Amino acid sequence: MSDRKNVLFVVGKSSAVKELEEFASCNADRANVKIEIVENIGLATDGPLYSAILSGFGADDNVSCDLNLLPTYTTLLTAGGTLIAKTDVGTEDALVKRMKLCGFLNVAKSESVPGVVVGNMPTYKVGSSDKVTLNPEMKENVVSAWKLDDNNSETISEDDLLEADDLIKPDSSSLRVCATTKKAKACKDCSCGLAEELEANRLKDTPKPDTSNAKSSCGSCYLGDAFRCASCPYLGMPAFRPGEKVQLAGNLLQDDF
């Protein structure tokens, strides 16, 4: 305890105060010793002042370290301060666990004195901040890893990605779409003229059948539809004279829709 550190003794009986005062006077050149009874320790308002706290070491003290006092000890100890607590033999593990939960570090049972547990406060204060120093060489290596060597990179021409069919311009007729559906298919009630245009293109591409040698099997075709059968090639045409040459339409036997 060099440099006259502040030490706090916590005892359970007032009878132990006198003996500890004699100890304090003998070591006054080494430490500032203060003695408190356990009933009064909760009233202490000294703040983080003590470098070490010894609890339950009075000669006539039969009271073990009160676990409920540990949070108070953390407020009285300075950063890195030491708590030496005495408890009943066999209950050291419970004290070790409670001290760890209160934030003490390096908590361990004494190997020389049974029933004694020692722990240290962290070297930092709650809410304190510290500067984090980064390795500049590591940062430079990370940046250089993403640099590209232009000499080794291969570029692909955009024209090489196109096929021969991609270079052909589409016909304007194939781009015609319905004003309603925006598709190259006429809607049911098409009024934009796409249906008529598609029908005209279909009829244009449909080969016309040869009807020059068409003959009637019943002999009544020239009389009109009233005398024609259901499969008559002249169905729907006006009556004509017998033997007259009639040119049939190219959409014969095809649906009107």
UniProtKB/Swiss-Prot annotation:
[2Fe-2S] cluster binds at residues 178, 187, 190, 192. The lineage of its organism: Eukaryota, Metazoa, Ecdysozoa, Arthropoda, Hexapoda. It is found in: Cytoplasm; Mitochondrion intermembrane space. Belongs to the anamorsin family. [4Fe-4S] cluster binds at residues 218, 221, 229, 232. Residues 1-134 are annotated as: N-terminal SAM-like domain. Component of the cytosolic iron-sulfur (Fe-S) protein assembly (CIA) machinery. Required for the maturation of extramitochondrial Fe-S proteins. Part of an electron transfer chain functioning in an early step of cytosolic Fe-S biogenesis, facilitating the de novo assembly of a [4Fe-4S] cluster on the cytosolic Fe-S scaffold complex. Electrons are transferred from NADPH via a FAD- and FMN-containing diflavin oxidoreductase. Signal peptide: none annotated. A motif (Cx2C motif 2) lies at residues 229-232. Its cofactor is [2Fe-2S] cluster; [4Fe-4S] cluster. Residues 178-192 are annotated as: Fe-S binding site A. Monomer. This is Anamorsin homolog. Residues 218-232 are annotated as: Fe-S binding site B. One of its GO terms (biological process) is iron-sulfur cluster assembly. Residues 135-168 are annotated as: Linker. A motif (Cx2C motif 1) lies at residues 218-221. GO terms for cellular component: mitochondrial intermembrane space. It comes from the Eukaryota. The C-terminal domain binds 2 Fe-S clusters but is otherwise mostly in an intrinsically disordered conformation. One of its GO terms (molecular function) is 2 iron, 2 sulfur cluster binding.
